[in-house]
């Protein structure tokens, strides 16, 4: 199990605390420092069952500068979104937990973190 976090994020800190409280075996990835590649983002999206626009923090200043709210949300624009996430990792929703069964969740709630633990 791996969790992608930004240590400054309260949701990330809460998720880590819950994982610790449950005695989970996991690896922390500080994704702003250890930036995921486009391929890694694709893999996580597949595991999440989501599209890149589903995990993009569209309210971030960088997102507004890029104009992502205006981008198409379909197969033709998928690579554009993934490239933006790789080049601007701050736009990636967090925390993302990759579960041992090959799936992943966006662990913004205790329920989502527990869901990842149960997989």
Curated annotation (Swiss-Prot):
Disulfide bonds join 9-12. One of its GO terms (molecular function) is arsenate reductase (glutaredoxin) activity. PROSITE patterns: ARSC. The keyword Membrane does not apply. Pfam families: ArsC. It comes from the Bacteria. Keywords: Disulfide bond, Oxidoreductase, Redox-active center. Belongs to the ArsC family. This is Uncharacterized protein in glnII region. It comes from Streptomyces viridochromogenes.
